[in-house]
Amino acid sequence: MEKNSSSPKIRALAKHIRMSTHRARRVIDQVRNRSYEQALMILELMPYRACYPILQLISSAAANANHNIGLNKANLFVSRAEVNEGAILKRSQPRAQGRGYPIQKPTCHITIVLEERSRSNNLIMPTEPKKGKYVWDRK
């Protein structure tokens, strides 16, 4: 948890999640710069396996913000979300005639930073979606 006098930033980190970074980034890109409630709705409706650990992480960060600092969950938004590569688990797959093929099982580290929306005046939300991306909250 990072505390500044201007705006508190609540950080939650999940390490060694047994998933490739590519699959986790596909989900993280959808919730970046969204409000806490929008992020929860998006994650509950997306059909990917990466949604569950990210949903747990965002919920944990919001609970920490509410309990430790006393922030309202309705005013929080995801100011930073990133996925980095973790350690690679190396295994061996038995093959014919006593051979063994190497198997690499990737892991990733997920970082979520929540911030209070009322105190962050310098955030500019994009009005038009990027070309080729699906927009969840069209009005």
Swiss-Prot record:
It comes from the Eukaryota. Its main location: plastid. The keyword Ribosomal protein applies. Belongs to the universal ribosomal protein uL22 family. One of its GO terms (molecular function) is structural constituent of ribosome. Keywords: Chloroplast, Plastid, Ribonucleoprotein, Ribosomal protein, RNA-binding, rRNA-binding. One of its GO terms (biological process) is translation. This protein binds specifically to 23S rRNA. GO terms for cellular component: chloroplast; large ribosomal subunit. The gene is rpl22. HAMAP family: Ribosomal_uL22_B. The keyword Nucleotide-binding does not apply. InterPro entries: Ribosomal_uL22 (IPR001063), Ribosomal_uL22_bac/chlpt-type (IPR005727), Ribosomal_uL22_bac/org-type (IPR047867), Ribosomal_uL22_CS (IPR018260), Ribosomal_uL22_sf (IPR036394). Pfam families: Ribosomal_L22. Part of the 50S ribosomal subunit. This is Large ribosomal subunit protein uL22c. It is found in: Plastid, Chloroplast.
